[in-house]
């Protein structure tokens, strides 16, 4: 359930962002298009940097225990419909995921590729964004005894370092978006 909601959420977020921004920038050409597209990518990049800074400052300090979000505790007990809804909400509404998906959609909108290229790009992004989740789910389903201890250690490491990992990802994504935005000008 969670994985289905996650994949649908990723596809919906990137597709909707691409569609809306394509409609907004579609009739524009020349200087107007370059200004709007450049500012759009700069805004996505700067927002990613702001969120990265917030995540870095909110990370647990040495000696303090990190807290998993409250939604993470209820995933295992959720029925398939609730798990799907949770996956969809997390893929579309979490600040980091929203920025990464909106950035991908914005890039697809301003690049103006053919429809089939957009379709394949969105599907590729959904596969990549879901692959780690799929590995964990398949591992638990088919080899729970073998993967439980390593995944437990991984979860402990993520608890301690999640803020730093998210900050690094958002810094890189923000840098790419800013670079694209500056390149358009």
Language model segments and positions:
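Interfacial loop-to-helix junctions that mark the boundaries of transmembrane helices
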Residues: 4, 26-41, 116-124, 158-162, ...
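Membrane helix-loop-helix hairpins that form the core translocation module of multi-pass transporters
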Residues: 1-69
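A short structural micro-motif
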Residues: 7, 157, 174-175
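Structural signal for alpha-helical transmembrane segments and their flanking helix-loop junctions
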Residues: 1, 69-134
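Hydrophobic residues within the alpha-helical transmembrane core of Major Facilitator Superfamily
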Residues: 4, 49, 88-89, 127, ...
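A small-residue-rich subset of transmembrane alpha-helices
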Residues: 1-25, 107-148
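Alpha-helical multi-pass membrane helix bundles of inner-membrane/thylakoid proteins
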Residues: 36-40, 47-95, 152-168, 185
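Juxtamembrane boundary at the C-terminal end of a transmembrane helix
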Residues: 175-185
